[in-house]
C-alpha cells in the first residue's frame, strides 16, 4: 500500500507479522506484538493523516494495532489492544 509518500507492506516472519514502512531512502520494520496468534493477514481498518502524522489501524482475529507514524522524526509507535472482550461477568 502506498500512502502520502510512504510504502506500507505487511510480511510474516518467524510466525509474527511485521509492518515494513519505507519513506524515501529509509525503511523500518515494526513488529506487531502478540501477532503469532493471528494466522490471517491483519486487515487495514483505516489510515488517516493529521498534520504530518499518519495513523493506521490494523485489525487481526483477536487483536488490533494502532500505529502512529511521525515521518519528520522517523519515529513509529505501535500499540496492541484486544479486539473485543470475551469474558463473562458474575451476576
UniProtKB/Swiss-Prot annotation:
It is found in: Host nucleus, Host nucleolus. Pfam families: Bunya_NS-S (PF01104). Transmembrane segments: none annotated. Keywords: Host gene expression shutoff by virus, Host nucleus, Host-virus interaction. InterPro entries: Bunya_NSs (IPR000797). One of its GO terms (cellular component) is host cell nucleolus. GO terms for biological process: symbiont-mediated suppression of host gene expression; viral process. Belongs to the orthobunyavirus NS-S protein family. Plays a role in the inhibition of the host immune response by interfering with the production of interferon in infected cells. Induces host nucleolar disorganization and host POLR2A/RPB1 degradation leading to host transcriptional shutoff. This is Non-structural protein NS-S. It comes from Bovine Schmallenberg virus (isolate Bovine/BH80/Germany/2011) (SBV). The gene is N.
